[in-house]
Amino acid sequence: LIGEMDLALAQARFTIYGVAELYNDQEKKSDLVNEINIAKHTVTNRALEVVDKAMRLVGAKSLQRSNPLQRYYRDVRAGLHNPPMDDLTIKKLAETAIQQMTKN
């Protein structure tokens, strides 16, 4: 599980740093809506995976108030309720892909 957790963290890190680098490019900045939404989706869902696996490793003690994992669990779940929602991100990506296919 620890290797899987590290992999998920690396995926999230590379995604967010990649989008941040694109965002710093003034010419591309205005065209990054999908990329930013992908980053939010990826980072939130990878964080959920990591916290869930960490809690599985620790067991029931991970739910105790004194354990920071219970707070991390709540904090990362909050990302699911902040826009854009996962289903809207996926729908927008599909719409963009269809538009690009019909242009060509």
Q: Predicted regions span which residues?
A:
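Nucleic acid-contacting regions in RNA/DNA-associated proteins
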Residues: 52
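Short, hydrophobic/aliphatic alpha-helical segments
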Residues: 43-48, 73
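Glycine-rich beta->alpha junctions and the first turn(s) of the following alpha-helix
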Residues: 1-10
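C-terminal helix-coil-helix/basic helical segment that borders enzyme active sites and/or dimer interfaces
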Residues: 10-42, 55-58, 62-63
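Glycine-rich phosphate/cofactor-binding loops in nucleotide/flavin-utilizing enzymes
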Residues: 61-104
